[in-house]
Amino acid sequence: MDNRTLLNWSSILKNEKKKYYFINIINHLFFERQKKMIFPPKGKVFNAFVHTQLYDIKVVILGQDPYYKINQAHGLAFSVENIVKFIPSSLKNIQKEIISDLGQNRSFSHGCLTKWALQGVFLLNSVLTVEAGKPGSHYKLGWERFTNKVISIINEYCKGVVFLLWGSYAQKKICLIDRTRHYILLAPHPSPLSAYRGFFGCRHFSKTNKILKQQNKSPINWFF
């Protein structure tokens, strides 16, 4: 059997999705969507897994939960739909750091990170859904059990992945990552509250590409 068949998300998460806690999450969302607005839309909750297969992962960026305003969240951490004109502050700060880090006089016309995902950047939120207007509303739904399992799978089946852990919440996942197999870069969260405490100047984008090149992997084109 082709190794890519063995290492695709569909096959490797098949048993996890049969577990009671996961079925309970899906059922809960089904009933919540009958009376509430939930983000991302139903068909986009698992976009991170659609755009970046397990065998393609070079980089993992961990977020918390999705954006809670309409037409923003589409299943990729920190990313917004390319039709969105207002770029969230954290993403705007990420863009600023990319420009500063890479020393290129370029600008961004949108905030959609799909091109990152297609290059092997796995954009995973720890919690995959949120109720409109209520940040953190699905923290107790059980998503973290699932996404912790996903991180553990990446840790086990991949090698030389660069984990970008921004902020204390993401950095709690360090215990799931084997530092002898992977690389971990730490920085404060890019939100306006903490970006000036060390996210700006962290140079994670150039550092990541340097690590990838050392492994004979193609670097990421961070401009989108």
Swiss-Prot record:
* Source taxon at top rank: Bacteria
Give its localization.
Answer: Cytoplasm
- What processes in GO biological process is this protein linked to? base-excision repair, AP site formation via deaminated base removal
Pfam families referenced in this protein's UniProt entry, alphabetically? UDG
Q: Which organism is it from?
A: Buchnera aphidicola subsp. Baizongia pistaciae (strain Bp)
Q: Which GO terms describe its molecular function?
A: uracil DNA N-glycosylase activity
Q: Which InterPro entries match?
A: UDG_fam1 (IPR002043), Ura-DNA_Glyclase_AS (IPR018085), Uracil-DNA_glycosylase-like (IPR005122), Uracil-DNA_glycosylase-like_sf (IPR036895)
Entry's Gene Ontology cellular component terms: cytoplasm
Protein name stated in the entry: Uracil-DNA glycosylase
Q: Entry's CDD domains?
A: UDG-F1-like
Q: What is its EC number?
A: 3.2.2.27
